[in-house]
Amino acid sequence: MTKNLLVELGLEEIPAYIVTPAMHQLRDRMATFLTDNRLAFDSIDVFSTPRRLAVRVRGLADQQTDLTEDFKGPAKKIALDADGNFTKAAEGFVRGKGLTTADIEFREIKGEEYVYVTKHEAGQPAKTVLAGIPEVLKAMTFPVSMNWASNKFAYIRPVHTLTVLLDDEALDMDFLDITSGRISRGHRFLGNETEIASADSYEADLRAQFVITDPAERQNMIVEQIKAIEDKHNVTVEIDEDLLNEVLNLVEYPTAFMGSFDTKYLEVPEEVLVTSMKNHQRYFVVRDKAGKLLPNFISVRNGNDQYLDNVIKGNEKVLVARLEDGEFFWREDQKLKIADLVERLKVVTFHEKIGSLYEHMERTKVIAEKLADLAGLSAGEKADVARAADIYKFDLLTGMVGEFDELQGIMGEKYALLAGEKPAVAAAIREHYLPNSAEGELPESKVGAVLALADKFDTLLSFFSVGLIPSGSNDPYALRRATQGIVRILEAFGWEIPLDQLIAELYSLNFASLTYDNQPAVMDFIRARVEKMMDKTIPKDIREAVLASSTFVVRLQLAASSAIFQKAKEADYKEAVENLSRVFNLAEKAEVTAIDEALFENDQEKALAAAVAGLELTEDMAGNLDKLFALSPVIAAFFDNTMVMVDDATVKANRLALLKALADKASAVAVFNLLNSK
């Protein structure tokens, strides 16, 4: 016979970003607890609001399954003394299992007898096991926790209720400073405390108290209400998924409504208005059918539609205060001169160990000019890169960015255009922040891409130089994101810039403000980001072989990893890799590089030398791999008919040099002896 179990934890309001992860954590911990304790169940439903986390376990067994375990102990010769009595070793072993020496039997394993005991444990009633639920709740972890009252324990928020029901039976247990029961709390303003009749009536009992416990249902309510507003007013609402997920975790009973603001604020840049509404007020943006921003917004109330007019007015008043700030900064910032703001960056700290933002910009300009050459930019584009690098951080000292830091770069572009800067320069100021996430938008212009690369390179090299290197999951300066941005930009623009050569050249620079250091660590860090870009289905040996190649060009390494992965599916892969691996293994022993054809002793040696001399690899990695695999029979014939490690030192050195010549060429694709040919 099975039952349904409900566990609800009632708390003060949880931060919206924690609600969903905490709900899933509770589900996972409950599933682990039940499984570890041999309580079978069918499924687990999850519920959450800002003031509660809950799970309902369906089809929970009424008793643990029985457990029978065999335990191996010491060898018989250790378990028995000379008189055949059990030793202390045997007695201690069985005592540790809760058994006696009467339970011992001997079993032979590979010719020697060992002590064995069998322990039978009858399953306990479910209610006995469920007394451990408080420990499940205590084990929950959160990004932030707090203490309250005079309690010594900490939790995400103060706990008010714990509801534990097995079907319709309330189970008593203590958690922190409360005792469980069947009481739950309704909506903070519209509902009351209520008794949950049974695990199955949970949603209905709280719905009567204006609480929608299912987050998916709340989300559907919000979306449907917004669509109704769209239809009524003939508008389009931007339903941003991240904002929607946040809003549904701010309310227990959602009611969407539309508010408005004065059209005069539409003179402020759209990005300012959208940031004010979306990021600061959690409002949805409203546009007309053509996509033009309207002086309206959609918000979601935590409650029903009573007194909604007052709620709308209150939300409008709060938004207007934000828009007033935006309008003021927009007006005042235009009075500032870019040159003056750049000069002031000399006293703005980039990092106390690295120097000022102005010094960061100076280094970035030098790097940008080198990158512009390597990327083949035109003279006009190079001039735009240089100008953008001179000023690109100026907007950090504007009032608008000081108030709305999300707009850095965006406002820089707008103010630069107003000041008469070229559109390409202004766009680069905005684009240098891109990408701002793992899958974020990339720069569109070459000028912006070069500036973005240069800024990220200096950031990476500077922090590594002063020992501020990410470790584990700790990356306070977002260096992984910056490096991922470097890799993505290089791949997207197809710039075949050898990163090892570039980094070496950058490390040769001597800046007055900072000397770069720690080159090997930087290279390994970049390689790790390139590996992240490779297809996740590509085996580790292929990734490592390609990353060790002599071609540290992002696009080519990504292409090589894909080409080898596809080649691995072909019948001749194993043999070809084995032959090339043998070449690489022996090539490591080479001490000279000159090849003397007069020392060749057989046709197979001459054939391999001719093949190596004629081998020309290009940027087509799949084609290169075909050429190398086509050499497999030639390599095999060479090894079948030629002893490399002969006594004659001159001949041996010549043959090793030949193999090294082939390995050097092939290493542009991969280091083949790192591949698994099994």
From Swiss-Prot:
GO terms for biological process: arginyl-tRNA aminoacylation; glycyl-tRNA aminoacylation. Keywords: Aminoacyl-tRNA synthetase, ATP-binding, Cytoplasm, Ligase, Nucleotide-binding, Protein biosynthesis. GO terms for cellular component: cytosol. Its main location: cytoplasm. The keyword ATP-binding applies. Its EC number is 6.1.1.14. PROSITE patterns: AA_TRNA_LIGASE_II_GLYAB (PS50861). GO terms for molecular function: arginine-tRNA ligase activity; ATP binding; glycine-tRNA ligase activity. It is found in: Cytoplasm. The keyword Acetylation does not apply. It catalyses: tRNA(Gly) + glycine + ATP = glycyl-tRNA(Gly) + AMP + diphosphate. Tetramer of two alpha and two beta subunits. Belongs to the class-II aminoacyl-tRNA synthetase family. This is Glycine--tRNA ligase beta subunit. The gene is glyS.
